[in-house]
Structure formats: C-alpha cells, structure tokens
C-alpha cells in the first residue's frame, strides 16, 4: 500500500534527476494535450526497450481489460526514443519516461501533471539497473496502471463538469435526488418512477446507461443472483431492434474446451468510491429475440435516505470496433455521483 501511495502522491522536479530533461527548455502557455484516451507514449531508448525491461513494461501496460468480448489492452503503447520525444511529442497526454542509469540511487516512479500541456500526466520511471527496474515493475505494475487510470478518469469527470448534459442531469436529480456529471452527447431515452435510461449513439456503436432503484430487503437483496434478477427486470424496458426484443443478461457462454456452453454469472466485487460502498458487477448483455450484445458494468449502493438500492448500469454495443474506450467513460460516471441529502 505504501508503494501505491508513493506513486500517487510523489511529484518531483524532473530537472533535478539524472539525465537530460527535455522539458527544461520548453516555456510558454500550456498546449492542449495530444494523443488518444488510454494511449501511453513510452520514452525509452533502444537497448532498454529491447531488454527484459521493455518486455515487462509492455506486459504491464498491455494487461488485458477484464470482461470484454475480445482481448483489448488496458493501454495502447506508443514507443519513441528520448531524442525524438524532445523535438516532436512533449505535449502527449500520457507520458512514461524510462531512465536506467547506475547513477540513480533508488528505483522509483514519480509523477508530474500538466508540464507542457493540459490535461497531461508525465511519469518518470528510473532505476540503477534493468534487473532492479524489472523487479520494481513486478511489484508495482498494478499501481502504475492505477495512476494512469485515475488520470483518464479525472479528465472525463472534469470535461463533464464543463461540458455537461445539463437537461439529463436535471432529470436524474429529480428522479433519484442524486447529483451526477454527465458529458454532452448522452441523450434522454426513457424514464419512470424508478428508472432513467440515456445513451450516446454513434454510427457504429452505442454507449448507454440506465439508473434504477428498488427496495432493499436485507442481505438477500444484494446477492449476485438477486442483483442480476433486478437488472433483468429493468433491462426489459430497453427495447431491441425488433418487435418484442429487449435487453437481458447473458447466462451461458461458450465453453472454450468444447463446442458446448457453460453457466455464467457476472464477476462481482465491492469497491469504495468517494467513501461509499458500491457492488460492482461485470458481465455481458444480449438481446432476447435478436442478435445483439456486449459488455456491461453495474454499480449498486444502498441509498439510506429511501431504504432502496440504487444501481447505475452501463453497457456498450460496438460489434466492429474496440469496446474499451466506450466502456471506460461510462464507468467513470459513478465517480461523479453524490447524494446531497446525505452530505448535509
């Protein structure tokens, strides 16, 4: 835990570190950061990149995203040499600079934010030897991913605060008495006394979420089976493309060992977000009586004010393209939720 905290809070002047600092000569106003979401520019010279260090670094950054229909990495890696970086790409949104030198006393990862562009995170990973840096990655790889994920999440939330879907936020506030920050592009689709559905439609994809509440009746209400049952009841309100079709939760998946199917339940864990416990479910959805489907992630918490369970359920449909960059911003929605009556 101390290692995670160190990476999260350590901010140092890169000019004080060993080696050339390509930022020192750059002055002036901040530029808009370049690069795509979930893309990391790794500044690493050839010897280190071709060594076990480069192999381990790629393995960490390209860790598969859990519970997607196909394999997608946590981050796409773009590698560049220090020389090319200095002249071409110092304003990238996510930068990881690699420095291996015997002059470095201790292996560490340190962070700076908005160095020459905004929003930007610049991580410097340094150590005295390749072996020491590889071992550090084995121990702290998940923390490195966490820091980069938090940077992406904060960008989503800040953008929603500035460019929000205010009309939709108002509908949700009136229905559930919660505050949310929702980016422009999401449009209201349907509502009832205990349900709101919104989506962002693209020519080749759909990015949507629905919020619903239902009575809390003790521990039996929050078993995985009960949560999936509740999900299916509300998902029926999301129509499919043909008459009588509707969304539901996948219950069986192909067996990789033969041509049959096996029973499947969404993955479950409890996460604490802004001091509140949420039950996270990750699984797959499909359309009853039609051929559509994709990944979903839902977050359920107890709204003590009403004695009800509140769920934010996020789904993606993207049959031709990757799903990571559609699903991640939906996951970020829950980090912008607040319960005003509980905060008084």
Predicted regions and their residues:
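Signature of long, low-cysteine stretches enriched in small and polar/charged residues
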Residues: 80-132, 239-306
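Start-of-domain marker
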Residues: 24-120
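C-terminal motif of bacterial Sec signal peptides marking the signal peptidase cleavage site
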Residues: 15-19
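Secretory pathway targeting signatures of secreted, lumenal, and periplasmic proteins
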Residues: 25-27, 41-45, 183-247
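Surface-exposed amphipathic alpha-helical segments
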Residues: 134-158, 186, 307-344
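Short, well-ordered beta-strand elements
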Residues: 120-132, 208-214, 308-317
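Short conserved aromatic/hydrophobic patches within beta-strands of well-structured domains
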Residues: 177-194, 333-339
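Bacterial N-terminal signal peptides that target proteins for export
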Residues: 1-8
């Amino acid at each position: 835990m101390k290692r995670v905290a160190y990476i999260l809070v350590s901010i140092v002047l890169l000019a004080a570190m060993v080696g050339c600092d390509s930022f020192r000569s750059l002055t002036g106003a901040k530029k808009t950061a370049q690069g795509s979401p979930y893309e990391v520019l790794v500044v690493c010279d050839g010897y280190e990149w071709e060594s076990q260090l480069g192999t381990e670094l790629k393995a960490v950054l390209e860790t598969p995203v859990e519970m997607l229909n196909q394999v997608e990495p946590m981050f796409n890696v773009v590698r560049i040499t220090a020389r090319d970086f200095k002249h071409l790409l110092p304003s990238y949104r996510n930068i990881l600079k690699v420095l291996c030198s015997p002059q470095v006393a201790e292996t560490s990862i340190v962070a700076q934010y908005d160095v020459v562009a905004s929003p930007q995170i610049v991580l410097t990973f340094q150590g005295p030897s390749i072996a020491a840096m590889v071992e550090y990655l084995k121990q702290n790889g998940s923390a490195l991913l966490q820091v980069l994920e938090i940077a992406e999440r904060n960008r989503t939330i800040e953008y929603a605060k500035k460019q929000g879907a205010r009309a939709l936020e108002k509908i949700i506030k009136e229905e559930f008495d919660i505050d949310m920050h929702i980016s422009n592009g999401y449009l209201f689709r349907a509502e009832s006394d205990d349900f709101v559905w919104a989506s962002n439609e693209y020519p080749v994809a759909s990015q949507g979420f629905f919020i619903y509440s239902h009575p809390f009746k003790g521990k039996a209400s929050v078993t995985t089976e009960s949560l999936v049952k509740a999900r299916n009841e509300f998902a029926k309100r999301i129509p499919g493309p043909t008459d009588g079709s509707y969304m539901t939760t996948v219950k069986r998946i192909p067996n990789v060992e033969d041509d049959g199917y096996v029973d499947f339940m969404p993955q479950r864990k409890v996460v604490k977000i802004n001091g509140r416990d949420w039950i996270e479910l990750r699984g797959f959805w499909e359309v009853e009586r039609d051929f559509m489907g994709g990944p979903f992630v839902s977050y359920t918490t107890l709204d003590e004010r009403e004695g009800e369970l509140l769920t934010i359920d996020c789904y993606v449909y993207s049959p031709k393209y990757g799903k990571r960059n559609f699903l991640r911003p939906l996951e970020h929605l829950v980090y912008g939720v607040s319960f005003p009556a509980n905060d008084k």
